[in-house]
C-alpha cells in the first residue's frame, strides 16, 4: 500500500495498491512544464514571492526577505544564465553560443526527488524552485509537520 497525500496540487490523503496513476501524472507534468516559456516561469515565481511576502511573511518568519529575494525574476534569471552558459534560452531551443562546431540545447533531467528536512523549513523551497525553473518535475517527501509547501 502506498499513501498519496497530494497530487496535481490537490490534497488526496488516500491509499492505493498501485502508483501507476501517479507515474502517469508525473510523465504528463514533465511534458507540460517542458512546454512552458522560461520567462513565464520566472515571472510566476517573482509574483509568488511577492504574494507570500504580503500574505505569509509572519508564517515564513525571519527568512521572509531572503525567500522573496531568491524568488525574484532577476535573481532566478541570473542563476539560470550562470548555469546555462550565459543564455537561459538554451533551455527553450537550440542556441548558437559562438562555438563553430556546436549548437546547444539544455535538457531537463526529468524528475527530481526532494527529501525535505523538518528542522529548516525554508530550504526545501529553494531546491524545488531550482528544479522547476530548469523544467524538472518534483516529487517531494515532506516531513509530517511541514507547512510551507
Where are these regions (language model features)?
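N-terminal Rossmann-like NAD(P)+-binding subdomain of aldehyde/semialdehyde dehydrogenases
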Residues: 1-107
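Conserved small-residue-rich beta-alpha loop and adjacent elements
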Residues: 92-149
Amino acid at each position: 500500500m502506498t499513501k498519496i497525500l497530494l497530487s496535481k496540487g490537490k490534497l488526496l490523503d488516500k491509499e492505493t495498491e498501485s502508483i501507476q496513476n501517479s507515474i502517469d501524472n508525473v510523465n504528463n507534468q514533465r511534458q507540460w512544464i517542458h512546454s512552458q516559456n522560461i520567462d513565464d516561469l520566472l515571472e510566476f515565481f517573482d509574483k509568488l514571492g511577492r504574494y507570500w511576502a504580503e500574505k505569509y511573511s509572519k508564517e515564513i518568519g525571519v527568512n521572509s526577505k531572503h525567500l522573496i529575494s531568491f524568488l525574484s525574476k532577476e535573481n532566478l534569471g541570473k542563476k539560470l544564465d550562470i548555469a546555462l552558459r550565459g543564455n537561459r534560452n538554451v533551455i527553450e531551443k537550440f542556441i548558437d553560443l559562438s562555438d563553430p562546431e556546436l549548437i546547444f540545447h539544455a535538457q531537463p533531467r526529468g524528475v527530481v526527488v526532494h527529501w525535505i528536512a523538518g528542522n529548516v523549513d525554508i530550504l526545501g523551497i529553494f531546491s524545488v524552485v531550482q528544479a522547476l525553473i530548469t523544467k524538472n518535475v518534483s516529487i517531494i517527501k515532506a516531513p509530517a509537520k511541514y507547512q510551507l509547501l
